[in-house]
Amino acid sequence: DHRDLHLSLRRQRQMCIRDRLTSLQGLAKKLVEVPKGFQLQRQVKKIYDDRLKMANEEIPVDWGFAESLAYASVLSSGNTVRITGQDVGRGTFSHRHAIVYDNKTGEAHIPLQNFQGDKSFSIYDSLLSEAAVLAFEYGYSTTTPNALVIWEAQFGDFANSAQVVIDQFIASGEHKWQRLCGLTLLLPHGYEGQGPEHSSARLERFLQLSAEHNIQVCLPTSSAQVFHMLRKQVLCPLRKPLIVMSPKSLLRHKKTVSTLEEMAEGSFQVVLDDPKQSDPSIIKKIIICSGKVFYDLSAERDNRNLSDVIIIRLEQLYPFPHEALESVMAKYANAKSVTWCQEEPMNQGAWYSTQHNLRRAMQSNFGGLELRYAGREASAAAAAGYPALHLSQQEKFINEALN
């Protein structure tokens, strides 16, 4: 009887996933439709052609299309979506293309307005005052609880021009006035040699502001993760601001892609175990990290052919996922060292505000071990100004993490 019930439940789940997959494919195909005779610019046409292949499951889904699919899915469930920022129609790094233009006439076309009518999806390339736009979007999102309201910084670094809005309203508004707000901030963040003004969304500031479950701080590292995260933000009945350290180079990284099936099933995972995990009993070193640095560590580990090193990703830093992290770490009980690795300098990033949480997660299985740090040395500026210095710093801390 138990076996029959188990089989029946499994069949139901498979049918449910199949239905969701069919629905997603329908949304995906609708996203690449353009009016008859509409002439796309050459590179944009290539992106849309690739997206049609993604819709047909010929190639995996990249970040830009996963994000668009999340919006389409939210719209088809009857919610509205609103996006503002200095270059959001195209996306600062040319990944979104939510607005496309006819190469001959200059006419604009917005595929996401085909889902629930043009009133349900709004996207505006806004003026260059971060404080003004973010303040307006905060007010808008507090009064429109069923909308997915997003403000995207051109680079995460520029959010500091709106620090007053973040401190006075977004982080503390619920505590001061019991005003709930579901605003989402997409802040491109990542150390890629572009210097101190184009590397850091100042993750440490958001973590310092975190208390009483006031905000969520996430660093998604795959297409499926960003899809589930954005859907969860509006479909979950709890309204909290969502701060996302969004990617730059990862937008086109071959390892960040996901299948449509991964989007049709599952949910946002606050902790990701290593996809390359082998026999857990042979693991001697655990590295815990967040964001892009996972792919830098993973590439170097493969390069050195290290089979006894595991890399665990924290996709959410606040609220801290204690139980999820402890349960993943428990599998590697034979490990002899635990390291936190970050690409930010020691006085920045997650180290200062997260190390006590990491030590707590170690207590049950690794109480006798000391938590190690691997990352850049403390710095007054967010990042090095010279690409060569950036690379030498990265090689040094990746080496420290893996040795």
Q: Residue ranges of each PLM-predicted region?
A:
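Alpha-helix capping and helix-loop boundary segments enriched in small/acidic/polar residues
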Residues: 123-128, 153-160, 193-201, 214-221, ...
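Conserved thiamine diphosphate
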Residues: 141-148, 183, 188-236
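Thiamine diphosphate
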Residues: 177-179, 190-206, 236-239, 251-403
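Generic secondary-structure signature for well-ordered alpha-helical cores
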Residues: 29-36, 76, 170-175, 208-212, ...
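Acidic, glycine-rich active-site loops and adjacent beta-strand->loop/helix elements
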Residues: 88-90, 153-157, 187-192, 223-224, ...
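Non-catalytic terminal/interface segments that mediate subunit docking, oligomerization
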Residues: 18-146, 151-174, 260-312
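Single conserved hydrophobic/aromatic residue that forms the stacking wall/gate
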Residues: 1-13, 17
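Short beta-strand segments
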Residues: 84-85, 184-188, 220, 243-247, ...
